[in-house]
């Protein structure tokens, strides 16, 4: 008799994706983050569902309903902080996952990579709309500033912004629709993640060497299931330390003040995971130019396969490219720091230089360095 997991139509899909999946024998812990993202997504959907049971998406009661969740709902505080800090863990895993893809040349799987970029955009949109929901000062002004950027689009800009707002300013209609979108998008993300996985399993996983591992595969279970569980335990440990010891570490104190359209906070800034893009936006004095740079900073990922000039896929044996990669990481950390600073000297010039360097490394230095490395190996 055939094993039910290999014959049952539904079990067969799960079996081929998570149990009998042939995986390279040498993938490192950098390959753990895909499964960690899946865990983050499940955690966010579950905590979000319980929060939605008590939250009200009305400008007069939204702030109070979040306070009510924290004070009166059984374990509401832990659900709220798991959700808020879970988003931070989600983005840490996302950035490492994308960084792994860049380092080891995983972007050569075109369909998987492009779906991944779409996923990144969708998760960023979801997180932005979620940040608006508590209706604190930073929620309101963050929503006003970021949506207002669309007015830079020629001809249709103003109409587009008013259409998104549902009025002439960020108000009740905006909050209600943001809640609706914030609720539905994670399910769209889940569907996209399934497609992401589908395309990945067409080719099989990449590995640190960047060369084919078809001759040396091992079953996903038990080898990588146990490895993923260890990674998940580490992540949950970090998340719980954050939630139980310093839940507001990554938040903004301004968001504990109810939204007031008549009082602008001194420094409007998004959550930490958007600061690098916010710094790039602010470093260009022109509104439309800034918006284009902001979009380009993420959209540039789609160009990665076209910018790959090396004869080797991975950076494992390319020390010059490795130096550039870590320069890029340092540059992104610098941009993140600048995004949280006020717009004054010397932060303006540091932000502008870091923004130029970001695009320079990806568009110019990396492709040229790859060609130099090819020539050094006389290829």
From Swiss-Prot:
Main location class: mitochondrion
Gene Ontology MF terms in the entry: metal ion binding; ubiquinol-cytochrome-c reductase activity
Membrane disposition: Multi-pass membrane protein
Family that this chain belongs to: Belongs to the cytochrome b family.
PROSITE patterns: CYTB_CTER, CYTB_NTER
SUPFAM superfamilies tied to this protein: a domain/subunit of cytochrome bc1 complex (Ubiquinol-cytochrome c reductase) (SSF81648), Transmembrane di-heme cytochromes (SSF81342)
GO cellular component terms, semicolon-separated: mitochondrial inner membrane; respiratory chain complex III
Cofactor note: Binds 2 heme b groups non-covalently.
The protein, known as: Cytochrome b
Description of how the protein assembles with itself and partners: The cytochrome bc1 complex contains 11 subunits: 3 respiratory subunits (MT-CYB, CYC1 and UQCRFS1), 2 core proteins (UQCRC1 and UQCRC2) and 6 low-molecular weight proteins (UQCRH/QCR6, UQCRB/QCR7, UQCRQ/QCR8, UQCR10/QCR9, UQCR11/QCR10 and a cleavage product of UQCRFS1). This cytochrome bc1 complex then forms a dimer.
Binding-site residues for heme b b562, renumbered to this chain: 83, 182
Organism lineage: Eukaryota, Metazoa, Chordata, Craniata, Vertebrata
Residue ranges crossing the lipid bilayer per the database entry: 33-53, 77-98, 113-133, 178-198, 226-246, 288-308, 320-340, 347-367
Cofactor(s) needed: heme b
PANTHER family in the cross-refs: CYTOCHROME B
Alphabetical keyword list: Electron transport, Heme, Iron, Membrane, Metal-binding, Mitochondrion, Mitochondrion inner membrane, Respiratory chain, Transmembrane, Transmembrane helix, Transport, Ubiquinone
Record: residues binding heme b b566: 97, 196
Binding residue positions for a ubiquinone: 201
Protein purpose: Component of the ubiquinol-cytochrome c reductase complex (complex III or cytochrome b-c1 complex) that is part of the mitochondrial respiratory chain. The b-c1 complex mediates electron transfer from ubiquinol to cytochrome c. Contributes to the generation of a proton gradient across the mitochondrial membrane that is then used for ATP synthesis.
Presence of keyword Transmembrane helix: yes
Note: Heme 1 (or BL or b562) is low-potential and absorbs at about 562 nm, and heme 2 (or BH or b566) is high-potential and absorbs at about 566 nm.
Cellular compartment(s): Mitochondrion inner membrane
Signal peptide extent: none
Protein's GO biological process: mitochondrial electron transport, ubiquinol to cytochrome c
